[in-house]
Amino acid sequence: MLKKAMNIADYDPELFKAIEDETCRQEEHIELIASENYTSPRVMEAQGSQLTNKYAEGYPGKRYYGGCEYVDVVETLAIERAKELFGATYANVQPHSGSQANSAVFMALLQPGDTVLGMNLAHGGHLTHGSPVNFSGKLYNIIPYGIDEAGKIDYDEMERLAIEHKPKMIIGGFSAFSGIVDWARMREIADKIGAYLFVDMAHVAGLIAAGVYPTPVPHAHVVTSTTHKTLAGPRGGIIISAADDEVLYKKLNSAVFPGGQGGPLMHVIAGKAVAFKEALEPEFKVYQQQVVKNAKAMVEVFLARGYKIVSGGTENHLMLVDLIGRDLTGKEADAALGSANITVNKNSVPNDPRSPFVTSGIRIGSPAITRRGFKEAEAKELTGWICDILDDATNTVVTDRVKGQVLALCARFPVYG
């Protein structure tokens, strides 16, 4: 017999301890992984609701199960809010992840073996943009493009590759690129060869929603995103479009269900609906503006301390610190900073001589610290501490000192006050 009083703490203390330990870790560590963020208690409330009990294969008004009248309301709210947020005429909120959203686009628009032009993972792309270890690289003929010596996307080279290889689809978007993408130029290239332009905006979706980063939606045939990262919602994916092409929309829907998924996660879709409503509020724009201000402030300190930033700066929420030529690997930097309660991730940089398991760089992002309330002053102070550790990564005196400073700063800015 189920009772509302049932709880994890009494029933499963081992699991409860792990959950509590993770809560403590998040409160006492500074999160700088560019793809991570803190979602709101309202989103978590939706995800913990009884919507988790409901199967709802199909789409609103066209389900394969009965009893879907209320989950139809939930999904419709999420769809309409996503369309409003991004200026789209189509939205599918069912993908369980960004990768599954991307997979659906490949399935809807391509045949196995088709040629695709995508950003090289080593230059800032994503696994699902054509990495040999991913489905995208295994099933399709991938032609990679990258960035030039200045860290910018070379659109002339992209156009040359497109004309030479005639891909059926060009992918825009990134996981470790700190510049502005010229979506209109990419659409021109795609149109020149009759290709689809598909944009994965996962990393900058929140910035785009707030109008602080150029939107790809008017230019791309189809756009995907995760709903966490800068959007600060639940972990999941979405597909949107403003192509006004009902045939395309039908293909995309079919590629999600039944093509790649069965029942949607209605509790997560409810969380997405909440997050989209939050992203439509005026304070969300203020937050995203601060995300970029904090990232720029951090870059300023890194450059002043003699560290190289790929692309020379940032126009979004992230930066890639290039450690080539230093007696420190990305893996070592990641571990040293972790010892001081600063969480980053090792990351390959262009022309990296080291393996992806070691790397010569670290990726840093400002969404989570901004969510805690950090402004430029705290971002600069924190970056100074990071540089102190990177300057002398094996010095435990420095690490211990920085850890104490981090704990004090975290206490001033709790995740959930």
Swiss-Prot record:
It is found in: Cytoplasm. Coiled coil: none annotated. Pathway: One-carbon metabolism; tetrahydrofolate interconversion; Amino-acid biosynthesis; glycine biosynthesis; glycine from L-serine: step 1/1. The keyword Metal-binding does not apply. Gene3D superfamilies: Aspartate Aminotransferase, domain 1, Type I PLP-dependent aspartate aminotransferase-like (Major domain). One of its GO terms (cellular component) is cytosol. Disulfide bonds: none annotated. One of its GO terms (molecular function) is pyridoxal phosphate binding. Pfam families: SHMT. GO terms for biological process: glycine biosynthetic process from serine; tetrahydrofolate interconversion. It catalyses: (6R)-5,10-methylene-5,6,7,8-tetrahydrofolate + glycine + H2O = (6S)-5,6,7,8-tetrahydrofolate + L-serine. Its EC number is 2.1.2.1. (6S)-5,6,7,8-tetrahydrofolate binds at L121, G125, H126, L127, S355, P356, F357. The modification N6-(pyridoxal phosphate)lysine is found at K229. CDD domains: SHMT. Belongs to the SHMT family. Homodimer. Catalyzes the reversible interconversion of serine and glycine with tetrahydrofolate (THF) serving as the one-carbon carrier. This reaction serves as the major source of one-carbon groups required for the biosynthesis of purines, thymidylate, methionine, and other important biomolecules. Also exhibits THF-independent aldolase activity toward beta-hydroxyamino acids, producing glycine and aldehydes, via a retro-aldol mechanism. This is Serine hydroxymethyltransferase. It comes from Shewanella frigidimarina (strain NCIMB 400).
